[in-house]
From Swiss-Prot:
CDD domains: F1-ATPase_gamma
Primary location: membrane
Domain of life: Bacteria
Location relative to the cell: Cell membrane
Family: Belongs to the ATPase gamma chain family.
Organism encoding this protein: Streptococcus suis (strain 05ZYH33)
Database matches in Gene3D superfamilies: 3.40.1380.10, ATP synthase, gamma subunit, helix hairpin domain (1.10.287.80)
InterPro entries with a match to the protein in the record: ATP_synth_F1_ATPase_gsu (IPR035968), ATP_synth_F1_gsu (IPR000131), ATP_synth_F1_gsu_CS (IPR023632)
Protein name as annotated: ATP synthase gamma chain
Keywords noted in UniProt: ATP synthesis, Cell membrane, CF(1), Hydrogen ion transport, Ion transport, Membrane, Transport
Keyword field contains Protein biosynthesis: no
GO cellular component: plasma membrane; proton-transporting ATP synthase complex
Membrane topology (UniProt): Peripheral membrane protein
Entry annotated with the keyword Ion transport: yes
Length: 292
C-alpha cells in the first residue's frame, strides 16, 4: 500500500511541474499575442493607404488605355503558386493541421500533377510536411520571429513576386490562418496575383486625374509591387497572430487538463491513504482482540 501511495504522490508532483511549465508557456504566448495583434493592427493602417492609392490610380484616367503590366494581366493558367504559412514548431493545437489539410485538398482538387503548381513554404512545419510527400518547395523560410519585421520576410516576398513576373507560375495565392480572436482562426486562401480585385471598371464615372513622374508605367510597376508585397506581409502578420493565439489556447488547455489530473490523483491518493489507515486500525484492533 505504501508503494502505491508513493507512486500516486510521484505522479502528482510530476504533473504539477508539467502544469507550471504549460502555465508559463501560456503566459509567454499571451504576451506574444498582444504584441503581434498590435503590430498587425498598426501595419493595416499602412496597407489600407497603399490599397487606397492603388485603387484610386487604377480607377483614374491613367487606366483609360490598356496596360501591359504583368501584375494586372490574367494569363492562361498553366501553373499556380501557393505561399503556405505555418509555424516552425508544434504545440499549436490544430493551427498547422487545418491549413495544411485545406491546401492539400485544394491541390488534389485543382491539379492533376506536381508540374501544375509550386509551393513557397513559410515555416518548418509546412516545409517538412510537403517534403515528406515528395513536394519540394521552390522557396522556403524557416525560423521566422514571432513578430517579424518586413526586412525579415522581404526576400521571400520579393522572390514570390519576381517568380510571378518571370512566369514561373501564372497566379499566386497565399494560404494561412486568419486571426479572428484568441479562440478562433479561419483558413484563408487569398489570390495575390494577378491583381484583380482593384479592377478600374468597378467605378464607372470616377473622374480623378493624376500627374505622375517620371511616367505612368514606372509608377504602376512600383506601386503594384508595393501593394502585392504589403498584402503578403499583412497575411504573414495575420498568420503569426493566429499562431500565437493558438499556442496560448493550447497551453491553457494543457494547464487545465493538468489541474484536472492533479485533482483526480489527489482524490485517488486520499482514498488510498484512508484505506491504508483503516487497514492499520483494523489490524491493531484484531491484534488487541487476539491478546484478550
Amino acid at each position: 500500500m505504501a508503494g502505491s501511495l508513493n507512486e500516486i504522490k510521484s505522479k502528482i508532483a510530476s504533473t504539477k511541474k508539467t502544469s507550471q511549465i504549460t502555465g508559463a508557456m501560456q503566459m509567454v504566448s499571451a504576451s506574444k499575442l498582444a504584441k503581434s495583434e498590435q503590430l498587425a493592427q498598426s501595419f493595416q493602417i499602412y496597407a489600407s493607404k497603399v490599397r487606397q492609392i492603388t485603387t484610386d490610380l487604377l480607377r483614374g484616367e491613367l487606366m483609360a488605355s490598356d496596360t501591359s503590366n504583368p501584375m494586372l494581366i490574367r494569363r492562361p493558367v498553366q501553373k499556380s503558386g501557393y505561399i503556405v504559412i505555418t509555424s516552425d514548431s508544434g504545440l499549436k493545437g490544430s493551427y498547422n493541421s487545418s491549413i495544411l489539410k485545406a491546401v492539400m485538398g485544394m491541390i488534389e482538387q485543382d491539379h492533376d500533377s506536381k508540374d501544375e503548381y509550386e509551393i513557397i513554404a513559410i515555416g518548418s512545419m509546412g516545409a517538412d510536411f510537403f517534403r515528406a510527400r515528395g513536394i519540394n518547395p521552390v522557396f522556403e523560410l524557416r525560423g521566422l520571429a514571432d513578430n517579424p519585421s518586413f526586412e525579415e520576410v522581404q526576400k521571400i516576398i520579393s522572390k514570390s513576386v519576381e517568380m510571378y513576373k518571370n512566369e514561373l507560375f501564372d497566379e499566386l495565392y497565399v494560404c494561412y490562418n486568419h486571426h479572428v480572436n484568441s479562440l478562433t482562426s479561419q483558413v484563408r486562401v487569398q489570390q495575390m496575383l494577378p491583381v484583380e480585385d482593384l479592377d478600374h471598371n468597378e467605378a464607372d464615372g470616377y473622374t480623378a486625374t493624376f500627374e505622375l513622374e517620371p511616367n505612368r508605367e514606372v509608377i504602376l510597376e512600383q506601386l503594384l509591387t508595393q501593394y502585392a508585397e504589403s498584402t503578403i506581409y499583412g497575411a504573414i502578420l495575420d498568420a503569426k497572430t493566429a499562431e500565437n493565439a493558438a499556442g496560448m489556447t493550447a497551453m491553457q488547455t494543457a494547464t487545465d487538463n493538468a489541474k484536472n489530473v492533479i485533482n483526480d490523483l489527489t482524490i485517488q491518493y486520499n482514498r488510498a491513504r484512508q484505506a491504508a489507515i483503516t487497514q492499520e486500525i483494523t489490524e491493531i484492533v484484531a491484534g488487541a482482540s487476539a491478546l484478550e
